[in-house]
Amino acid sequence: MLWIKNLARISQTTSSSVGNVFRNPESYTLSSRFCTALQKQQVTDTVQAKEDVVNALEPQRYDGLAPTKEGEKPRVLVLGSGWAGCRVLKGIDTSIYDVVCVSPRNHMVFTPLLASTCVGTLEFRSVAEPISRIQPAISREPGSYYFLANCSKLDADNHEVHCETVTEGSSTLKPWKFKIAYDKLVLACGAEASTFGINGVLENAIFLREVHHAQEIRRKLLLNLMLSEVPGIGEDEKKRLLHCVVVGGGPTGVEFSGELSDFIMKDVRQRYSHVKDDIRVTLIEARDILSSFDDRLRHYAIKQLNKSGVKLVRGIVKEVKPQKLILDDGTEVPYGPLVWSTGVGPSSFVRSLDFPKDPGGRIGIDEWMRVPSVQDVFAIGDCSGYLESTGKSTLPALAQVAEREGKYLANLFNVMGKAGGGRANSAKEMELGEPFVYKHLGSMATIGRYKALVDLRESKEGKGISMAGFLSWFIWRSAYLTRVVSWRNRFYVAINWLTTFVFGRDISRI
């Protein structure tokens, strides 16, 4: 019995000693670290093994739209939803091709009427047409899609583009990256507003190229009108808030100035009578306004704009500060809303592409809209221009140019597809027929007070009809009403014009 008791004491002592060893903080930490590291390594090895198995079982795995196979329709990928891109989408034969559109906006903007939305003459939806209405196959066909995304990289050798979804600054949504393989690629990504490297333009000016630009201008204009009536505001600050400055004397700048003067004379004078004598419009241009129009029409436009209260200033903007801009002669011009409309230039995406460029930095193309250095890549619209080797001058960045290029390219694709050249690398030796030829159909611009300019000459030096006045305004409205993309939008535009004529412009700040 004594032997058994001694053995029990020894066992308790040993067990207690071992327990004390493992309860030692240093010993416990080292052990747990070792075990944790071992477990993590085992988990990592397991995950890697699973990935290896998946990759082995799925050799064709593709993050996006994989290359088309035999028996499937060839895929035409269109980057952009402007005039050129949407005209391709509209004209392409979807019984031959699947179409995919990638763009940060899901609609086309009818830009000739965009200035009218800034002051409430038209509603914003009247100038926007959804892509799925332009090409119904996008919402119906299993192989056709629209993706809300931007193209981040172009791999022409492998016939694929890398895209990233647009989340519009949402903190809860992370951009998703994916790839799209194509048989034919159409670069119709447009251009961006030219700032000429002037300090402060991007931070302080508003451009007029998209619907959200028009919305911003409208909200800014109505906000300044309301703030100018607040008691106690200084006289200088009131004049600054009510001074609308437009930089750029092209058709967009002149049309916006005309719409703005109509808004002031008809609506502001009735509904903001306390400040009706303080609101002003200034149009700044470095050269002659409407330089592409006939001289007689230009002088008529200047006369009418002056009658409408628009002040014309010739000068070059050197710097834009938060509440004033500085001209080349040192003149300081205070402003409330500042609208920048000085033309367009290549976008950052176009500049990043390793393609030959035209003299203006746009994607270089031949007479068939092809990018000569790569296979199955075409460029149309404002992002493209003829290479010097073609001997052709670069076409102007106009809606009618982009639309007609898009129509030509859609017809070219349809012919190629019917001849068996729709797939990637299948049209290398194919005769493409007649090259694209542009014929200018003329220019039109409204200048306010039921007046407009119509210049139907093929060039500034050519002969043709040019007219101005009320009849021109009627022609301008009739032409654009018939050119609006769909019957739905034509109905909207006609109703908006009628309600504005009867009840005046909507001044709600929404």
Curated annotation (Swiss-Prot):
Gene3D superfamilies: 3.50.50.100. Transmembrane segments: none annotated. It is found in: Mitochondrion inner membrane; Peroxisome. Disruption phenotype: No visible phenotype. It comes from the Eukaryota. One of its GO terms (cellular component) is peroxisome. FAD binds at residues 75-105. NAD(+) binds at residues 242-278. Induction: Follows a circadian regulation; up-regulated in a diurnal manner. Up-regulated by high-light. It is an enzyme of class 1 (oxidoreductase). Binds 1 FAD per subunit. SUPFAM superfamilies: FAD/NAD(P)-binding domain. It catalyses: a quinone + NADH + H(+) = a quinol + NAD(+); a ubiquinone + NADH + H(+) = a ubiquinol + NAD(+). GO terms for biological process: cellular response to light stimulus. A motif (Microbody targeting signal) lies at residues 501-510. GO terms for molecular function: NADH dehydrogenase activity; NADH:ubiquinone reductase (non-electrogenic) activity; NADPH dehydrogenase activity; oxidoreductase activity. Residues 1-48 form a transit peptide. Expressed in seedlings, cotyledons, young leaves, stems and flowers and, to a lower extent, in roots and buds. Pfam families: NDH2_C (PF22366), Pyr_redox_2 (PF07992). Its main location: mitochondrion. It is a peripheral membrane protein. PANTHER family: INTERNAL ALTERNATIVE NAD(P)H-UBIQUINONE OXIDOREDUCTASE A1, MITOCHONDRIAL, NADH DEHYDROGENASE. Belongs to the NADH dehydrogenase family. Alternative NADH-ubiquinone oxidoreductase which catalyzes the oxidation of mitochondrial NADH does not translocate protons across the inner mitochondrial membrane. This is Internal alternative NAD(P)H-ubiquinone oxidoreductase A1, mitochondrial. It comes from Arabidopsis thaliana. The lineage of its organism: Eukaryota, Viridiplantae, Streptophyta, Embryophyta, Tracheophyta. The gene is NDA1.
